[in-house]
Each structure stands twice: as C-alpha cells, then as structure tokens.
Amino acid sequence: MKISGGGRCNVTHACFDARELTRRYPRGERALIAPFKQFQAADTVAWFEQRGVKLKTEADGRMFPTTDSSQTIMDCLLNLANHAGVKLKTNCDVQSIVKAAGGGFELTLANGKQMPCDKLLLATGGCRTPALGQLAISLGHTLEAPVPSLFTFHVETPWLRELAGVSLEAVEASVPGAKLRERGALLLTHWGLSGPAILRLSAWGARELHDRNYQFALQINWLPDANPEKLAAAFQTCRRSQPAKFIVNTPLAKLPSRLWEQLVIASGIARETRWAALSGAGQHRLIQQLLRSEFPVTGKSLNKDEFVTCGGVRLNEINFKTMESKLCPGLFFAGEVLDIDGITGGFNFQAAWTTGWLAGRAMAES
C-alpha cells in the first residue's frame, strides 16, 4: 500500500456500475458480480469519506486521497484498528495452521508459540511464490499456479531504446496469434515498453505470455485512429504542400518528432529524402511501420508500483456471499490470495476492499 500509485495509493477507480467494474478483472470477473453488488467502488469512497479521508478522481478514473499520500490511507486503517482493540503482531510468521479438535484453529508461530482462534481470515496477499499459498493448501484448498501480472516488456530494438522517455497518449498494442489487444498510453523506456496499454496487455495475457516464456512478437499501431487510406491521402497532401521538405523533419499527426524520425528510417527511407521524392514502395513501408510496427519481446520486468500475481486459491472453493471456505468451515479469504487480479488503475485494491468487507461482516455475524 505504501508504494502503490507512486506512493500516493490508488485506492479505487471511478467505475460505479458493479457489472462494468467486473470487466476490469482478467481473473475473477464472474465471481465478483455478486460481491460488487454488496460493496463496490462507490461504497469504498463513502467508507473512507465517512472516516475523514476524501478521495479525488484523476482524468483516467484513478482515485487517490486528496493528500496524494499513501500514509493517509495507512493512518486511517491503523487508527481504526487500534480504536477497535485490534492487536497487531509483527515479525510473527505463521508456520502452520491445523483445525483444532474442539473447533476453530491452532496456529504455530515461527517462535514455536501456539495461537488459537475461533475463525481465521487468510489475507496473505498475492502468491508470488507457491510457498505463500501453502497455508491454504494445508487446509485443503487448491492453488492455481501463480504467475506475474502487470509487467512491462523488454525490447532489444536499439532505436526504440534510444527513445527512452518518449510517451504517447494513445496507441494500440497487440500480440499476433493471440486474442490480446489493448489501447492506451505508452511509455518508451531504456529497457523497452511500459505504460497503461502494456500493463493491461500483460494482465489479460498473464498466463499465455508466461507459457511463451515472455518471448513473443508485439505489434504497435502508433496511430490507432488512422488507416492506410487516410495516411496515403495525408502523404499526398504533404507531396503537394511541402514537396521540398525532408520527410524526417515533418512529423505526421502530432507524433513525437524523435519517434517519427526513427519510424521513417526504420521504413528504409533515407534521411535526405524529400516529400516530392517519396516512392510508392517507400510510402507503403512507412504506412506499415506506422500501423504495424513489430518488435521482439525478450522478457519482462515487474511494474514498480504494483506487485500483482495471476493465480491463487481456486475460486470455486469459496462462498462469495461470505468469503468463507466451502471446504473448511470457519476459514475465510480476502484479497490477492485468491485467484483474482485486475488491470492497473485501482482495481486490485477494490477487490481487496470488497472481499475484506464481506469476510469481516460474515465473521462478525456468524
């Protein structure tokens, strides 16, 4: 929480229709329909505001505390827990959990001490390694193998890396041969590609890209609102209106000048080529480069603001009205320990707030 959203804490997303909200989850969409009808993003906003924490909405729908500080959210939760008499035990690893003979559970801590409880909530976070899911497995649950989600792409193409820092508001990224296509902002980095379009693509393709060992072809459409006919007409206009100008010096459609220059050169058009001298073959190659640039992805890096995994406790083993285990009465689950993950933008926090609220209410009432 402290480092999420660049240290500002992306609490939730301004998507206040429960069914629409579920569509932001590559894993867990169907399971979250009923829970979001009980507690969704609007309820999260109201919950925090009733406790003195106001949220603001940014242009892309992400919601943050008005203080722009994760500490505000942390202080709110810690103060409420303290007021409720919650005891926080840190540096207190749980080594094992067993069902107690007389009901409830017996926890064995790393220091050898035993801790009994009547009901138990597992909210251990994403299972970044299989070991983190062992507590759930020991109580009879099945773990969908964890793999990374929300990661950036390594691309070795030299000219692309030279453009580190260049950003675009809207491109379309896709993986040929897969049903993976996302539109959004893109950031060129010294290791390859990042930004919302890439992060969302990585979330929807988490398992498929893992199975490809993160080595695949990526296509970028730099002008998703254009088509070959529109570009051909624009080039013809340039031939007539500025025939003596060098193509590399006259970016089209407000593309960043450095990017335009590299795309022209990558199309096999010499730097000294003027618009009047642009051949039909050169025009075709440039249109292809603008609409279907292809790059070999050679690996991934985790997004530094979010540590999200695809995978976790199998959803058909959970009662989503209460978040109680169907296999082990008295055991509850919440958050990313479940096989639920959302795209970037506050959706993973929202799933945690919702499942935590349902589990807490059910544990208190049962």
Where are these regions (language model features)?
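An anion/pyrophosphate-binding glycine-rich loop and adjacent beta-alpha core
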Residues: 2-3, 12-18, 54, 142-147, ...
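A glycine-rich dinucleotide-binding beta-alpha-beta segment and adjacent secondary-structure elements
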Residues: 90, 262-341
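A conserved short coil-to-beta-strand element within the FAD-binding core of flavoproteins
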Residues: 90-104
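Short hydrophobic core segments
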Residues: 94, 114-128, 135-137, 186-191, ...
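A conserved FAD-binding loop/helix module that cradles the flavin
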Residues: 123-139, 339-366
